[in-house]
Regions:
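Conserved NAD(P)H cofactor-binding loop of Rossmann-fold oxidoreductase domains
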Residues: 83-90, 127, 268
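Conserved glycine-rich Rossmann-like NAD(P)H-binding loop of the short-chain dehydrogenase/reductase
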Residues: 26-41
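A conserved structural motif in NAD(P)-dependent oxidoreductases
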Residues: 232-243
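Rossmann-fold cofactor-recognition segment
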Residues: 46-64
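Catalytic loop of short-chain dehydrogenase/reductase
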Residues: 90-92, 122-196, 206-210
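Short, small/polar-rich loop/turn modules that mediate ligand/substrate recognition or access, typified
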Residues: 200, 258-260
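Conserved glycine-rich cofactor-binding loop
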Residues: 12-13
Length: 280
């Protein structure tokens, strides 16, 4: 029987590890991230639980490295799931890196796996609740549609945030919102492409979950984190296992008619923020 492979980028991050634990119940997993030592630590943990695990260092902003990842995955077996969680936060990175990792990395991953994903396979790209924080502008859509396959994509996206360049935090935050909106739109642009291989593609937009990246925000800017928590109607942060459970459902046969959509899992934060609430 041919081995079934779930490829997970951000493989040593909080969400990546949780997803590997969940999908590893039914498939082998290939973890990708930039730090191979950390990947091997996760590999040891997963293998101790009986999950066949492979690792490969990969910078998702590098097309050649992503193509090598796809070729390696294809050599291992049928690539049934591609879960692209890799991303960087505007609290830790400046706007150029935010755009390269979150937007260009998504293009590289989607392009590389669109031609090898197995019949019935599913790709899930990770966006963010931040994609819903700003109203999508027609100018953004024009750029998304005209430059998605162009070397100019980075330049065009950076032009949108350049007016904020005198403030690194605001510039990075704007870049993050736009890049994550791009992830949703670009995933939807690929529905037909994946359907030709009888595969599906979706995106998910997590709100604030207790991952190492979010813990860094809590540690660096506790007042901002406290304000965010106040805006979440369920009254708590999300947990990585809640994302992994969602992913397990989305790649299952039970979700076979879900395609080309974004799933917002934010505890009600977006609704509370942008929709007038009864009783207010």
């Amino acid at each position: 029987m041919t081995r079934k492979i779930s490829v997970i980028t951000g493989g040593h991050g909080g969400m990546g590890k949780a997803i590997a634990l969940e999908l590893g119940k039914k498939t082998s997993v290939l973890l990708a991230d930039m730090n191979e030592d950390k990947l091997n630590d996760v590999k040891s943990n997963l293998e101790s639980l009986g999950i066949e695990t492979f690792v490969k260092a990969c910078d998702v902003t590098d097309k050649e490295q992503v193509q090598e990842l796809a070729s390696y995955a294809d050599s291992l077996g049928d690539v049934v799931n591609v879960i692209h969680t890799s991303g960087v936060s505007p609290t830790l990175c400046k706007a150029p890196q935010v755009i390269r990792v979150n937007a260009l990395g998504t293009v590289n991953m989607t392009d590389a796996f669109a031609s090898i994903i197995a019949d019935g396979g599913v790709m899930v790209n990770f966006s963010s609740v931040a994609a819903y924080q700003l109203e999508t502008q027609d100018e953004w859509i024009d750029i998304f549609e005209q430059y998605y396959d162009s070397d100019e994509l980075y330049d065009r996206l950076y032009e949108l945030v350049e007016p904020f360049a005198d403030n690194d935090f605001n510039c990075a935050g704007m870049a993050y919102c736009i890049a994550k909106r791009f992830v949703i739109y670009y995933s939807q642009m690929n529905v037909d492409r994946f359907a030709r291989r009888h595969a599906r593609i979706l995106s998910v937009s997590p709100g604030s979950h207790l991952t190492p990246m979010h813990q860094a925000l809590i540690d660096l800017q506790p007042e901002i984190a406290e304000g965010q928590l106040d805006d979440i109607p369920v009254g708590r942060w999300g947990h990585p296992y809640e994302i992994s459970s969602l992913i397990a459902y989305l790649v299952s046969e039970q979700a076979a008619f879900l395609n080309g959509i974004d799933i917002l899992q934010d505890g009600g934060q977006t609704a509370k923020t942008f929709v007038t609430q009864i009783g207010d």
